[in-house]
UniProtKB/Swiss-Prot annotation:
InterPro entries: EFG_II (IPR041095), EFG_III (IPR009022), EFG_III/V (IPR035647), EFG_IV (IPR047872), EFG_V (IPR035649), EFG_V-like (IPR000640), EFTu-like_2 (IPR004161), G_TR_CS (IPR031157). This is Elongation factor G 2. Keywords: Cytoplasm, Elongation factor, GTP-binding, Nucleotide-binding, Plasmid, Protein biosynthesis. The keyword GTP-binding applies. The keyword Nucleotide-binding applies. Catalyzes the GTP-dependent ribosomal translocation step during translation elongation. During this step, the ribosome changes from the pre-translocational (PRE) to the post-translocational (POST) state as the newly formed A-site-bound peptidyl-tRNA and P-site-bound deacylated tRNA move to the P and E sites, respectively. Catalyzes the coordinated movement of the two tRNA molecules, the mRNA and conformational changes in the ribosome. CDD domains: EF-G (cd01886), EFG_III (cd16262), EFG_mtEFG1_IV (cd01434), EFG_mtEFG_C (cd03713), EFG_mtEFG_II (cd04088). It is found in: Cytoplasm. Belongs to the TRAFAC class translation factor GTPase superfamily. Classic translation factor GTPase family. EF-G/EF-2 subfamily. GTP binds at residues 17-24, 88-92, 142-145. It comes from Cupriavidus metallidurans (strain ATCC 43123 / DSM 2839 / NBRC 102507 / CH34). GO terms for biological process: ribosome disassembly. Pfam families: EFG_C (PF00679), EFG_III (PF14492), EFG_IV (PF03764), GTP_EFTU (PF00009), GTP_EFTU_D2 (PF03144).
């Protein structure tokens, strides 16, 4: 079956923003204007098509990134048909993992900002993730109809806080109640949308006289930005020669795709203004799969390999999300990077080393699914029937194996014990938790060996609350949850040289003999664990060295202070000895473990606690109370600024997670319910001696 839309006319984009910037409404309008969706879904009444899980509709926040396909021929029907695959991403910090994994499979992003709130904490997180995966982006300043809306202030914030080179390609006509439309700086004409047709009809008009000077100023800045795309354009621009519309667009596109500029637009999705022009900008400035570098990976024998976005290349795809669907079971969302695959084909998963048959292939429009027979390079679809695949796995042609770069997932920072309300539900709860953990790699399930309790871990209180809620709704398991526990870590500050570990058992017959000498030292923060083999002259035989490493790795799971996982250490095997008959892998595993434990005790072990970046938005009269309260929680207040558009202060602080449980309740009573806060994991830091002592003693008693 030939391809309907050439790959050059594909756009795989994400729409991401801070909570409440109007991202879901923006996506809904896209679906409406692209003719897919004939009734506008409003988040206010819980009917938005993209928000398809029950809790999302209740909370009014988007939790799961639904992937949707839409077609667009331009606001004025002036383009050949383009296919836009949209991944809707959540804006709440507890769901950062969702944003992270959608960024991994996107080619471009549209960042939505609230014209009043501007750049908020989650906006910064999303921006960092987009930088990590080098995702080109455009910015859409939404809610221009709100009181306090200020397009140019948001531009300054993008420059100051995000270090983004934002280039307006539109400026607003009016603001707040008087927001009428935009000035298109490329055409130098105003666009006014017609309210009666819900913004489907529009007209170009002359720029209002009071805006002519401002429009000219920003037009010149935009043309200069476009001219910097090439020597030739720059020379013509500097010699005073005008650039055509086409040349301006080409220059802006080149620089956007290279990540050098961020074109800026504005509108009000709720009032049906500006989204149509934003779709045109997606086509004009964001890359198609062929405009971004080929995807890199490696073959099974670890040679570097790449796949180009072409139907003629071998099939390769990345599974980026797993969902459980009540009707068809497990859905695996995947992005095809190269080649073609048909339903019924066998694909290979090199991460799991398994071949699997691809069952049905579904293309999702929010939660409405269309079954299709094949997918090609650039497509995003969902597969039914893959049992082994998990998030981040590669799917590829069994004869042309490639392993694409895996995604990195954050470690959970909070844990809770969970048990079913009735004993009969124990098994059902196990199945439910495993299913949820498969869907969400930042959610972990484990059994506490001492107490036998089931422990769930995640990125924040809201994250775990929603998962427990889903367990009840989707699997019918009611569970009670224990008090949240902090995920402490242990590390060392000092070095320990020549630490000996001997495991000897010789009582007649075959004995055990393992003897190693280690140097143990700290690694930089985030450095993880490193094992170095520095054995000379075969004093420890080659075949036993991996066993020493294994013994140390096992010991890393329970540190010497309070049994928490050990991070950021380096162990160097420097010496040892063996016995011809009695030495074996197990003996060296035990010796490695004993030596490392002793080394850790001698190398100044310390307890680390997770520190959270906290931002509180509060009316001015409560600022003192809020800051005092954060300080009493061992918080360090880093700064304070006015909330954009007036109305209070933003207090920024770094606070230990251990002191932040139940903070939302305290904040409500401190500020008569008028303040809001966001919190996300920042880094691990050494816990003060008195805190460490209390944690260690509690573990001993427990």
């Amino acid at each position: 079956m030939p391809r309907k839309t050439p790959i050059e006319r594909y756009r795989n984009i994400g729409i991401s923003a801070h909570i409440d910037a109007g991202k879901t409404t923006t996506t809904e309008r896209i679906l409406f204007y692209t003719g897919v969706n004939h009734k506008l879904g409003e988040v206010h009444d819980g009917a938005a098509t993209m928000d398809w899980m029950e809790q999302e509709q209740e909370r009014g926040i988007t939790i799961t990134s639904a992937a949707t396909t839409a077609f667009w021929k331009g606001m004025a029907n002036n383009y050949p048909e383009h296919r836009i695959n949209i991944i809707d991403t959540p804006g709440h910090v507890d769901f950062t993992i969702e944003v992270e994994r959608s960024m991994r499979v996107l080619d471009g992003a549209c960042m939505v900002y609230d014209a009043v709130g501007g750049v908020q904490p989650q906006s910064e997180t999303v921006w960092r993730q987009a930088n990590k995966y080098s995702v080109p982006r455009i910015a859409f300043v939404n809610k221009m109809d709100r009181v306090g809306a200020d397009f140019f202030r948001v531009r300054t914030q993008i420059a100051d806080r995000l270090k983004g080179n934002a280039v307006p390609i539109q400026i607003p006509v009016g603001a707040e109640d008087h927001f009428k439309g935009v000035v298109d700086l490329v055409k130098m004409r105003a666009i006014v949308w017609d309210d009666d047709s819900q913004g489907v009809r529009f007209e170009y008009t002359d720029i209002p006289p009071e805006l002519v000077a401002t429009a000219k100023e920003w037009h010149d800045k935009m043309v200069e930005a476009a001219a910097e795309a090439s020597e030739e354009l720059l020379e013509r621009y500097l010699s005073g020669e005008p650039l055509s519309e086409e040349e301006i667009k080409t220059g802006l596109r080149k620089r956007t795709v290279a990540g050098e500029i961020v074109p800026m637009l504005c509108g009000s999705a709720f009032k049906n203004k500006g989204v149509q022009a934003m779709l045109d900008a997606v086509i004009d400035y964001l890359p198609s799969p062929v405009d971004v570098p080929a995807i890199l990976g490696h073959t099974e024998d670890d040679k570097e390999a790449e796949r180009h976005p072409s139907d003629d290349e071998p099939f390769s795809a990345l599974a980026f999300k797993i969902m459980t669907d009540p009707f068809v079971g497990q859905l695996i969302f995947f992005r095809v990077y190269s080649g073609v695959v048909n339903s019924g084909d066998t694909v290979y998963n090199p991460v799991k080393g398994k071949r699997e048959r691809l069952g049905r292939i579904l293309q999702m429009h929010a939660n409405v699914r269309n079954e299709i027979k094949e997918v090609r390079a650039g497509d995003i679809a969902a597969a039914v029937g893959l049992k082994e695949a998990t998030t981040g796995d590669t799917l590829c042609d069994p004869d042309k194996v490639i392993i694409l770069e895996r995604m990195s997932f954050p470690e959970p920072v909070i844990s809770q014990a969970v048990e079913p309300k009735t004993k009969a539900d124990q098994e059902k709860m196990g199945i439910a938790l495993n299913r949820l953990a498969q869907e969400d790699p930042s959610f972990r399930v484990a059994t506490d060996e001492e107490s036998g309790q089931t422990i769930i871990s995640g990125m924040g209180e809201l994250h775990l609350e929603i998962l427990v809620d889903r367990m009840k709704r989707e699997f019918g398991v009611e569970a009670s949850v224990g008090k949240p526990q902090v995920a402490y870590r242990e590390t060392i500050k000092g070095k320990a040289r020549d630490v000996e570990g001997k495991f000897i058992k010789q009582s007649g017959g075959r004995g055990q003999y393992g003897h190693v000498v280690l140097d143990v030292e700290p690694m930089p923060q985030g450095g993880g664990y490193e094992f170095v083999d520095a054995i000379k002259g075969g004093v420890v035989p080659r075949e036993f060295i991996p066993a020493v490493d294994k013994g140390i790795r096992e010991t890393l799971e329970t540190g010497v202070l309070a049994g928490y996982p050990v991070v950021d250490v380096k162990a160097t095997l420097v010496f040892g000895s063996y016995h011809d008959v009695d030495s074996n892998e197990n003996a060296f595993r035990m010796a490695g473990s004993m030596a490392f434990k002793e080394g850790m005790r001698r190398a100044k072990p310390v307890l680390l606690e997770p520190m959270m970046a906290v931002e509180v938005e509060t009316p001015e009269e409560f600022t003192g109370n809020v800051m005092g309260d954060l300080s009493s929680r061992r918080g360090m207040v880093h700064g304070m600024e006015d909330i954009a558009g007036g109305g209070g202060k933003i207090v920024r602080a770094e606070v230990p997670l251990a002191t932040m449980f139940g903070y939302s309740t305290s904040l409500r009573s401190l500020t008569q319910g008028r303040a809001t806060f966001t919190m996300e994991f920042k880094h691990y830091a050494e816990a003060p001696a008195n805190v460490a002592e209390a944690v260690i003693n509690a573990r001993k008693v427990g």
